[in-house]
């Protein structure tokens, strides 16, 4: 697992995107980064 602040933020953003698709366009740049792990 990744414990860095950046990775944690990406994981949180990815969780939010899956929780509420309305946030997808807002978090899309971060979501792309989260998909790399």
From Swiss-Prot:
Keywords for the protein's UniProt record, in alphabetical order: Amidation, Amyloid, Disulfide bond, Hormone, Secreted
Organism domain of life: Eukaryota
Alphabetized Pfam families for the sequence: Calc_CGRP_IAPP (PF00214)
Compartments (UniProt record): Secreted
GO molecular function, one term: hormone activity
Annotated domain remarks: The mature protein is largely unstructured in the absence of a cognate ligand, but contrary to the human protein, it does not easily form fibrillar aggregates.
Name of the protein in its database record: Islet amyloid polypeptide
Annotated source species: Cricetulus griseus (Chinese hamster)
Gene: IAPP
